[in-house]
Amino acid sequence: MGKVVTLGEIMLRLSTPGNTRFVQSDSFDVVYGGGEANVAVSCANYGHEAYFVTKLPKHEIGQSAVNALRKYGVKTDFICRGGDRVGIYYLETGASMRPSKVIYDRAHSAIAEADPCDFDFDAIMEGADWFHWSGITPAISDKAAELTKLACEAAKRHGVTVSVDLNFRKKLWTKEKAQSIMKPLMQYVDVCIGNEEDAELCLGFKPEANVEAGETNAEGYKGIFKAMAKEFGFKYVVSTLRESFSATHNGWKAMIYNGEEFYESKRYDINPIIDRVGGGDSFSGGIIHGLLTKPNQGAALEFAVAASALKHTINGDFNLVSVDEVEALAGGNASGRVQR
C-alpha cells in the first residue's frame, strides 16, 4: 500500500434529521466531513498510509475534527493547529423531486487564513506515492489557492503522482475565477477527475449533455477527454456519469481515458439513496486505490464506481467500507442479502 497525502478543509456538518427542512428542524445531526478529508478516510480504510493536511483551531471543536479523522485511521501529523474557526456547512437532505440543499458558513476558517509558513510541504511529500486535492480548496480563499500551488510544486519535486477532483462549487467562486486559478494548476496534475459540469466550469470544456436535466452521454465525453489530455498532459482523465431521476434515485457509472484507450464501467441503479454527500469523494478515493493497486485502468475504475455506489447507502460524509466489500459489489454481488 502507498503513502497518500490530501490537502483541504474538514468541516462541521450540521444536517437536519431525516428529510426535514431547515425551517422545520429543532436540532441537527453532527458529523465531520470535507472533500479531501473524505478521500483520506477512504484511502485509510483501504489500507493506505493516509495523511490529511489542514489547519484547525486548538479549541475543542478543532480537536473533535482531528479525532474524527483519527477514528478511521487517518494520520494527522501534518495538521497545523491555530486560527479561530472550523468551517461549518448545513445540510437539508432532499427527497423525490425536492433536491438537497447546502448552506456554507466557512468564511475565515483556519485553513482559509493559513499561511505558507504553517506547512513544510517538502517534509510532507517525502516518501509519498500520491497527492490529492480538489477545486474546493483553492476556492476557499486566495491563501488556500497559494497553499495548493505550493503543495503541488513540492509533490512534483518529490516525484509524487498528483490527482485533482475539479469539484466546482458555485457558492464559493465564479467560473471566471475558477478557470483563472485552476487552469495554471493543471500543469502539476497527472490524474484529472471531474464530472461534466466541472469540466466546463473549471476548464472550459463543454460536453454534449444537459446536466440540469440529469442527462449523461458517454460518447460525448470522448472528444473532451482527448482534448483535456492533449492540452494539459494528463495521464488519466476520469469522469463520473450520474443520471438523476430524483433526489433518492440515481444511475451511476464512470469513464476513464489513459491517452490511448477509453473504458466505461458497469452502471449501478442506486435506489433509494441514503446520503449522496461524499459520493464523488468516495469515487476519488476508489480511483486512487485502484490506480495504485490494480493491474489496469478498467479494474481501477470498476473498484472506484463500486466504492462510490456503496457510499450512497451510508450516512455521513465518510465512505466506511472495506476493500472486500467493494470488490464483492464490483464482482457482481449486489443482492444486499444478510452476510452470515
Predicted regions and their residues:
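Conserved phosphate-binding/catalytic loop of the ribokinase/pfkB sugar-kinase fold
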Residues: 92-145
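A short helix->loop->beta-strand "cap" motif at the edges of active sites that frequently abuts
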Residues: 154-161, 232-235
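Hydrophobic faces of well-ordered beta-strands that scaffold small-molecule active sites
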Residues: 162-164, 192
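Glycine-rich phosphate/adenosyl-contacting loop at the front of the ribokinase-like
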Residues: 1-75, 79, 95-97, 111-116, ...
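Conserved post-catalytic alpha-helical subdomain immediately downstream of the catalytic base
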Residues: 263-333, 340
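Acidic-glycine-rich active-site phosphate/pyrophosphate-binding loop
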Residues: 6-20, 250-265
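Conserved phosphate/ATP/ADP-binding segment of small-molecule kinases
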Residues: 172-260
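Active-site metal-binding loops of divalent metal-dependent hydrolases
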Residues: 10, 136, 166, 282
